[in-house]
Amino acid sequence: MTDLLHKLNFKIADASPEYKQRRKIQMIRFFTASAVTIFASRFAYRATVSRQYIPTLFQGNHSPPLSYNFTTDAAVAVGTGTLLCGSVTGMTVFGLCWILDVSNIQEFGWRMKSMLGGWESEKKLSEAPMDEESSYIQDSLNDILDGKYDFEEDTEEVHTAEMKTK
């Protein structure tokens, strides 16, 4: 198989076995979601056709038969719609993950950040000068995290200030 891929000049021929396995798993997920979508659409089609009301020659076509159950019909419609929506969404998500070579949420975040220019924006923002108030807050938080700030001393000062105001 690799010889054929080299002969046809495919880049995946030079890829590692781990990469090929990863792409294979992504492909299997997409095709599984596609198969579920096909089965769900066939189920929805059959559910719709079985509930179709076909009147006889002299019956009106505007009123359903007396044995018709609206509650069951509504429940089947909601369930079928939810099944179709979920399966199409899964197929779309797995298809995009296969195209973008993404296997988990963290990789999706990295990929979107790189595609939308997030790395450059973050670099520019980190190089920007910080204003005085933000610098003071950052230094205070760092002091608290480093254990340099004494909370007991601060509460004594607050109590002393409260006593003076009373």
UniProtKB/Swiss-Prot annotation:
Entry's Gene Ontology cellular component terms: membrane; mitochondrion
Q: Which topology term describes how it sits in the membrane?
A: Multi-pass membrane protein
Which keywords are on file for this protein? Membrane, Transmembrane, Transmembrane helix
InterPro entries cross-referenced by the UniProt entry? AIM11 (IPR038814)
Which ranges of the sequence are coiled-coil?
Answer: none
- Where in or outside the cell is it found? Membrane
Keyword Transmembrane helix, does the record have it?
A: yes
What are the transmembrane regions?
Answer: 27-49, 78-100
Predominant place of localization:
membrane
Record-stated family: Belongs to the AIM11 family.
Name listed for the protein in its UniProt record: Altered inheritance of mitochondria protein 11
Could you tell me which species this protein originates from? Candida dubliniensis (strain CD36 / ATCC MYA-646 / CBS 7987 / NCPF 3949 / NRRL Y-17841)
